[in-house]
Design a protein with these regions (language model features):
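A cross-kingdom marker for long, charged
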Residues: 136-226
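Short, structured motif recognition centered on aromatic/hydrophobic residues
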Residues: 28-31, 102-107, 177, 181
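Coiled-coil heptad-register positions
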Residues: 39, 46, 74-77, 81-84, ...
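Post-signal peptide N-terminal segment of secreted/secretory-pathway proteins
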Residues: 1-48
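Extracytoplasmic/periplasmic, Sec-exported soluble proteins
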Residues: 16-19, 23, 58, 98, ...
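Extended amphipathic alpha-helical interaction segments
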Residues: 56-174
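Polar/charged, Q/E/K-enriched amphipathic alpha-helical segments with strong coiled-coil propensity
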Residues: 32, 36-64, 192-207
């Protein structure tokens, strides 16, 4: 925690995010101290649980104060990440790194699909309430981006430019992402909820789409980052 506060005073300046880190320090430090006391305390029942009541009062007050800032902080981090990703994708496109660009863009669209669902308050337990208006637009963009990715990987000169020897660096994973999204759309259009009673993520569920997206991210990191 001390390191986080110290970094908030250092360059680069992240403006409001630095301020939020400092605002979270006091309630978070109080929570950490209280939990540390609880872990070493054996007298909960003494004095009609008075000590436990004192702990709870500190936890409730500071948890609310921390959460009020923490959620905004997480949103701010996400927004900053989106901006930086957009800048990186623009750079890749301008430099003609079309395989890398389209792979990254496909993954970004996948994240936008999940963001859209969650912004609507949707999960797999109320998936049939998902408004597909924006989802369909994202689907069409994803199809176009994956088509551009396939065209770029079919170009030997482009493979050489990006130092790739494999013309199928994603082994069809991006096509699988399209399929996973189309299964969601069909599931919603059916009016039925996906069967979540099994051990795996069923086709047509957000959980399955998230799993496939995770595979794409792992492959991207293997091909372009690692």
């Amino acid at each position: 925690l001390d390191d986080c506060v110290m970094l908030a005073d250092m360059e680069p300046d992240f403006g409001e995010m630095d301020s939020m880190v400092k605002e979270m320090e006091e309630p978070l430090r109080a929570l950490m101290g209280t939990f540390l006391e609880i872990s070493g305390s054996n007298d909960y029942a003494d004095n009609q649980y008075q000590k436990a009541k004192e702990y709870h009062a500190v936890i409730y007050a500071n948890a609310d104060a921390f959460a009020a800032i923490a959620y905004d902080f997480v949103d701010a981090v996400g927004e900053m990440g989106d901006v930086r990703m957009a800048e990186e994708e623009n750079r890749l496109k301008e430099e003609g790194m079309l395989i890398n660009y389209n792979a990254s863009r496909a993954i970004s669209i996948g994240r936008e699909v999940l963001d859209e669902a969650y912004a609507q308050g949707i999960d797999d337990w109320n998936l049939n309430e998902l408004d597909l208006t924006e989802i369909r637009k994202l689907h069409d963009e994803l199809v176009a981006v994956v088509a551009d990715f396939d065209a770029a990987t079919a170009d030997n000169d482009q493979l050489v430019k990006e130092s790739l020897s494999n013309s199928r660096p994603f082994d069809g994973l991006l096509d699988g992402l399209i399929d996973a999204l189309e299964w969601i759309m069909k599931q919603v259009e059916s009016g039925e909820l996906p069967d979540m009673s099994g051990s795996g993520a069923p086709l047509g569920s957000l959980e399955h789409f998230s799993y496939v997206l995770g595979q794409c991210i792992d492959r991207y990191n293997t091909v372009f980052v690692d």
